[in-house]
């Protein structure tokens, strides 16, 4: 009965999110595999040269642009972080993070799932040039994790899906904080003040409930540039922009007009093809329905497929390719061990222990419909770090520490693969065990 209530509580938005993210995760995985194959084939020189190709335009003696790799990591990934920011804002206002009672359990789980992997990595790499990579195993890739859960289907309780999504959203928020605090260097305060000025204008637009997305996006480009120049990673600008996008629906609701249009359409005669009148009515319905959506919903709906089926797969293809040959030094400090143990051991232990202790201390309450063994299974799947871990590895290790970056990427792929396989087998066995007991 509790599971039925939980399933009914799962909003349509959340269900669509599960679907898009899970299929996006499969596509993401295929691109990561393709990158590894190409990076270790006769095409490897062309593959690595491609990402250093400059793209932009020349103005006199000045070149305005970036390498293809920077376009992906700094510009396209900003759109991905914009979508993450929109998701976080929605969950904070209306979703599973909207109240302390709802949010406390997954948020504490996310904190434990970030601290434990970070500590394991740092302990193994303390006092080495690679210690700065402690943020790498802290992240969870929700697309991959949900892809695994969707493959398991009904064997996974709906309540566990909700918990994992909420945990991943809180984890994303934590990763953003980690990037802002620990992977920011050489701050330029003049540019930072410029960014704050843009944020102030965005806040005024939000306060006035300006519903057109155009001024927000134009100011967002300016904010991105200021933040990029300030020394803070530019993707943080996208998250700030997301929090400034209005979420209120219009007061002059179009419901009555939609009903009237629906009645008009029902009264028209049906044929093989739509008549001109029917096309006009449907076009009006589409416009009125769009007007009912908040700017946040419209932007999120627009970005979801672009992010899931273009930006993330392209990021995976550009970053997952590592040439594994005799020249690579797998013994760079303890990077390989730190990342793999952080993802495969630190994530499940951190999530399980901190939630178990917090419930015993009556700080939080476990969601109905899932047991402690389910929480451990979610912890195993949370060890699939891939996308965000790859992103943080690019920030943690510069070109001067290329060996560590390459080893970290191999470790992320191995750790994520191990976590995904063990997590899937574990939840499958858990379901079988429950079925036998019945």
From Swiss-Prot:
List the catalytic activities from the record.
Na(+)(in) + 2 H(+)(out) = Na(+)(out) + 2 H(+)(in)
Task: Please give the Gene3D superfamilies that the UniProt record associates with this protein.
Answer: Na+/H+ antiporter like domain
Which BP terms does GO give this entry?
A: regulation of pH
Q: Which residues cross the membrane?
A: 23-43, 62-82, 104-124, 133-153, 162-182, 185-205, 212-232, 302-322, 337-357, 372-392, 410-430
Q: Single GO cellular component annotation?
A: plasma membrane
> Cell inner membrane: is it a keyword of this entry?
yes
Q: Which InterPro entries does this chain map to?
A: Na/H_antiporter_dom_sf, NhaA
**Which cell locations does it reside in?**
Cell inner membrane
**GO MF annotations in UniProt:** sodium:proton antiporter activity
How would you describe this protein's topology in the membrane?
Multi-pass membrane protein
Is Transmembrane there in the keyword field?
Answer: yes
Q: Which UniProt keywords apply?
A: Antiport, Cell inner membrane, Cell membrane, Ion transport, Membrane, Sodium, Sodium transport, Transmembrane, Transmembrane helix, Transport
Q: Say which family it is in.
A: Belongs to the NhaA Na(+)/H(+) (TC 2.A.33) antiporter family.
Function, as annotated: Na(+)/H(+) antiporter that extrudes sodium in exchange for external protons.
- The molecule here is called Na(+)/H(+) antiporter NhaA
Gene name, per UniProt, is nhaA
């Amino acid at each position: 009965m509790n599971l039925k209530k939980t399933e009914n509580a799962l909003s349509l938005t959340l269900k669509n999110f599960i679907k898009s993210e899970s299929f996006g995760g499969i596509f993401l995985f295929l691109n990561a595999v393709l990158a590894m194959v190409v990076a270790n084939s006769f095409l490897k020189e062309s593959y690595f040269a491609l990402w250093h190709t400059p793209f932009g335009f020349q103005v006199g003696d000045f070149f305005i642009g970036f390498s293809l790799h920077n376009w992906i990591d700094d510009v396209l990934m900003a759109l991905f972080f914009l979508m993450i920011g929109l998701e976080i804002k929605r969950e904070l206002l209306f979703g599973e993070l909207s109240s302390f009672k709802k949010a406390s359990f997954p948020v504490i789980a996310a904190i434990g799932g970030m601290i434990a992997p970070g500590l394991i990595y740092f302990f193994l790499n303390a006092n080495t040039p690679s210690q700065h990579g402690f943020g790498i195993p802290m992240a969870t890739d929700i697309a991959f994790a949900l892809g695994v859960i969707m493959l398991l289907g009904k064997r996974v309780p709906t309540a566990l899906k909700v918990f994992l999504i909420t945990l991943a959203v809180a984890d994303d928020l934590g990763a953003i904080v980690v990037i802002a605090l620990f992977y920011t260097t050489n701050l330029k305060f003049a540019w930072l003040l410029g960014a704050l000025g843009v944020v102030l204008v965005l806040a005024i637009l939000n306060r006035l409930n300006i519903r057109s997305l155009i001024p927000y996006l134009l100011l967002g480009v300016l904010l991105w540039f200021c933040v990029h120049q300030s020394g803070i990673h530019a993707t943080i600008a996208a998250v700030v922009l997301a929090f400034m996008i209005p979420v209120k629906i219009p007061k002059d609701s179009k419901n009555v007009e939609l009903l009237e249009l629906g009645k008009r359409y029902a009264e028209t005669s049906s044929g093989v093809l739509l008549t001109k009148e029917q096309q006009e009515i449907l076009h009006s319905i589409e416009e009125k329905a769009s007007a009912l959506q908040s700017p946040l919903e419209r932007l999120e709906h627009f970005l979801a497929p672009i992010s899931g089926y273009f930006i993330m797969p392209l990021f995976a293809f550009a970053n997952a390719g590592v040439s594994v040959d005799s020249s690579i030094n797998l013994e760079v400090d303890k990077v390989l061990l730190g990342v793999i143990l952080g993802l495969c051991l630190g994530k499940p232990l951190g999530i399980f222990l901190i939630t178990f202790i917090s419930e015993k201390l009556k700080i939080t309450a476990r969601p109905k419909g899932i047991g402690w063994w389910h929480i451990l299974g979610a912890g195993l799947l949370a060890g699939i770090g891939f996308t965000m871990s790859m992103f943080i590895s690019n920030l943690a290790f510069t070109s001067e520490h290329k060996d560590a970056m390459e080893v970290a990427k191999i470790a992320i792929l191995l750790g994520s693969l191990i976590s995904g396989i063990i997590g899937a087998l574990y939840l499958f066995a858990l379901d079988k065990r429950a079925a036998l007991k019945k």
